[in-house]
Amino acid sequence: MKPKVLLGCPVYDGKDYIIERFIDRIKNLTYENYDILLVDNSKTNDFAKKIKSLGINVVKLKWDENSKKRLVISRNYIRDYVLENGYDYFFSLECDLVPPRDIIEKLLAHKKKVVGGWYYICAIPYIRPCLAREWTLVNMQFAFKEELFEKMAKTKLMKVLQGSFGCCIIHRDILEQIRFKTYITMPHPEDTWFYLDCEKKGIEVYVDTDLLIPHFQDYKWDELVKKNKIEDLKQMKHKEDEFKYEVVDIN
């Protein structure tokens, strides 16, 4: 039997502009043994109700004012769901990316525990791939190196230090070792800390450079993150008991 895969994604109502196109694609992937779970962290229940009306399995979690907390809480709900329901892989796919219909087969074909596609993100002052081969920090941000493109051109399956959760498949063995986290006082998102934990544990991470995924990015989320960066400085660092999820009934 083919590995059992859960396609999971945190969502919120700021992605309403793309959600129907995203759902149309994920409902029609060619892989034979996958399920879908979207976890809504919007402030109201309206977006979750819309997703449910489109025939998608959705869970609504209690709102938290901090956007970084919302993401980690949502992603850990998905992680726990994978482990508790016998899935072999968590396919993390962000809802503003539209992958090819055979994306799961292409990722599984590499037989790696952590492997993803890639996409461009808008990061002032340049547009760059959302991945890194080495940890190079400038002003507490990961710095982009232009020679990355040369490496990508020469290597189909490239070993990296950091991919992203935008399009990545993770084996349950890895999820059993690593719980998603963030540090409120730091600017980096939870996927950065996941890949740092992979490095610490000697877990290899790969990106298929052939799998460039269209990314329909907006900037509402960027503004939320900027707002939270200011607020985060007033708060304490990551504490596991501050990141518990609570399911909300949308019926």
Question: Residues of each region from the PLM?
Answer:
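Active-site-proximal specificity loops/subdomain of glycosyltransferases
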Residues: 46-87
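Short beta-strand/loop segment that forms part of the nucleotide-sugar
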Residues: 33-43, 60-63
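C-terminal catalytic/acceptor-binding lobe
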Residues: 157, 162-164, 172-173, 177-251
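Cell-envelope/extracellular polymer assembly enzymes that use nucleotide-activated donors
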Residues: 4-8, 35, 193
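Conserved catalytic core of nucleotide-sugar-dependent glycosyltransferases
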Residues: 100-182
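Short beta-strand-to-loop acidic/aromatic patch adjacent to the donor-nucleotide binding site
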Residues: 86-98
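A structural helix-start
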Residues: 11-20, 40
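Short, acidic, metal-binding catalytic loop of nucleotide-sugar glycosyltransferases
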Residues: 23-34
